[in-house]
Amino acid sequence: MALFSSCKMYDNLPEGDDKPALYLTKEMGKLTDLLTGNANGWRLVLLPGSYQYGGINIAFKFHKGGAVESYSEDLDEVIHSSYRIYNTAGIRLTFDTRNPALGRYAEPRNTLLQGLEGDFEFTFGDVSADQDTIQLIGAYSRNKMMLVRLKEDAESYINKVKDIRNAVYGKALATTTIGGEEVKMSVFGLIRQLQVKVGSAEPRLIPINFSTEGIEVIGADDLIDDSDASQGKVGQIGTEILRQIKVVKDGSTYHALSPSGQKIAIQSTDYDFTKSK
């Protein structure tokens, strides 16, 4: 549903006692209650720009009064900062004090005046009927993302993501078969891209994010080139759309699983993809 009613943004706003200003104030209060009402927190996959850095896992614990704790797969420390929900051309969530979990992708750096094309401010979209997911739209990137209610503690969740990330960071996956094609894959952890070489074709990069289950392909069903559908979809490998590669702990080590369940060894590579980790 759109926010908490059938009214979205400024369409068909009620009148009288529920005139627009009061309506929006009530909606902002409901969103605040929703965010602060889950002690475990909320998880987000941050999607900068055109997914050139893949997706970054961040978990938040929102508190009454505007305090927020942020846990990022990039950072070892917990970030304590503040947030605010306000109205400007839609109800927005902004992280209004320094927050390195978001800022490292949103703040200008050196010659990159646009930063890494990430967001620290978002417009609220739809809230699911069960109130377990909240759509966010990046104010800068315009990318659609999801806040998802956590069923476990935020720090515990991020630590599990880190375990998966560390297991495959800068590693190659043994040759396997997907969609009837022989496939070689390597994980570029720093920029969160999966290098995929199908048969004799040139390698290509697929944007990914890590999860507690493995490697997730971002925008698997999107066209590689919107102007040329013949190039196929982002996750297209032979007859199959690659959406996920599961990563499973096996004693003290890990292995991957193909979409068909085939076991794939995780191997060291001839190149150090982990430089500047």
Segments from the language model and where they lie:
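Preference for solvent-exposed, low-hydrophobicity sequence contexts
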Residues: L150-K277
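Short linear motifs in intrinsically disordered
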Residues: K30-L34, N57-F62, E121-V127, K184-M185, ...
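N-terminal accessory/assembly segment that mediates macromolecular interactions
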Residues: K61, A67-T123, P203-G261
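C-terminal motif of bacterial Sec signal peptides marking the signal peptidase cleavage site
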Residues: L3-S6
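Acidic/polar, low-complexity intrinsically disordered N-terminal segments immediately downstream
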Residues: K8-R92, S156-K171
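Long, acidic/polar, low-complexity amphipathic helices and coiled-coil-like
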Residues: A67-R192
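Acidic-enriched, low-complexity/disordered segments with a strong bias for Aspartate over Glutamate
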Residues: D11, E15-D18, D33, G54, ...
